[in-house]
């Protein structure tokens, strides 16, 4: 089912309109903005990842999901022709597939200028605007960069949840699962988790080693950790996760002389206090922490077009 959230009354009489997407593999958030009255609306469709999906698959999502939503929002069956600018930020938008994604969007939004970029640049623009800063993504996985106000200057490779992704939900899940079964966390926490989640040791091993999307399962344990954050052992685990993220990633950008660090993603958002403690420990100051980049992306593009 497609979800939409109205942030303000949306006008149907439009002039210059822009469409911005923040896309992951499971969900894409789209924000539609009309320049003549300042109103905007966010809608969601299934995820688009040009690295894993074919041109035909992407175009079907655009035609069957995005266009009907736009037509409904704008009360116009020719809604695609009203869009004059499209910015698409996606997790799978590596250099090798940028032209592919641009082509898919151009085929739908023929009247629009199209820009396609990776999710890290989108996060940096949403968090820092046109100012230099350190931008981080902390969700299921993690990523970070030093951004000079225009482009990403340096990106410490996150290496994924097996080799890296410090600070992420998946990394927190690894620490948690390891801790409850190797005895580094108290027995009562292990029993509480197994009972609340109605899961066994064997099922956990199955999900991690034999089922797909082990990273998402590991990250899902962060909900339990957050729920029981009053337990000092779990609070310490969260702190250790963020300390590791700063030590192995953020500290590598210290030579640029910028101390402000900002983050997007549910792990940074819900565990913000621990994130701020880790930042201070390593000599940084937290500027912004947002759960989603979509409104920051819109603010960036509005300012750029003025």
Region annotations inferred by a language model:
Residues 85, 113-115, 260:
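Proline-centered loop/turn at the N-terminus of a beta-strand
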């Amino acid at each position: 089912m497609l979800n939409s959230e109205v942030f303000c009354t949306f006008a149907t009489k439009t002039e210059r309109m822009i469409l911005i997407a923040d896309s992951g593999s499971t969900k894409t958030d789209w924000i539609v903005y009309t320049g003549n009255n300042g109103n905007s609306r966010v809608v969601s469709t299934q995820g688009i990842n040009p690295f894993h999906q074919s041109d035909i698959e992407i175009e079907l999502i655009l035609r069957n999901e995005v266009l009907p939503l736009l037509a409904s929002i704008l009360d116009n069956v020719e809604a695609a022709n009203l869009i004059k600018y499209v910015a698409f930020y996606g997790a799978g938008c590596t250099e090798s597939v940028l032209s592919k994604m641009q082509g898919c969007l151009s085929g739908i939004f023929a009247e629009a200028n199209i820009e396609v970029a990776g999710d890290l640049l989108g996060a940096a623009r949403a968090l820092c605007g046109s100012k230099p800063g350190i931008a981080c993504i902390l969700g299921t996985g993690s990523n970070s960069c030093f951004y000079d106000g225009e482009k990403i200057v340096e990106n410490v490779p996150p290496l994924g949840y097996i080799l890296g992704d410090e600070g992420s939900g998946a990394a927190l899940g690894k620490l948690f699962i390891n801790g409850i079964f190797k005895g580094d966390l108290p027995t009562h926490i292990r029993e509480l988790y197994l009972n609340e989640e109605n899961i066994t040791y064997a099922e956990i091993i199955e999900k991690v080693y034999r089922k797909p999307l082990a990273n998402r399962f590991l990250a899902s344990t962060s909900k339990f950790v957050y729920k029981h954050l009053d337990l000092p052992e779990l609070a310490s685990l969260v702190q250790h996760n963020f300390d590791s993220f700063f030590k192995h990633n953020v500290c590598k950008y210290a030579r640029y002389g910028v101390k402000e660090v900002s983050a997007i993603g549910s792990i940074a958002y819900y565990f913000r206090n621990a994130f701020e403690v880790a930042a201070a420990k390593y000599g940084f100051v937290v500027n912004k922490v947002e759960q989603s980049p979509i409104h920051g992306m819109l603010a960036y593009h509005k300012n750029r077009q003025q």
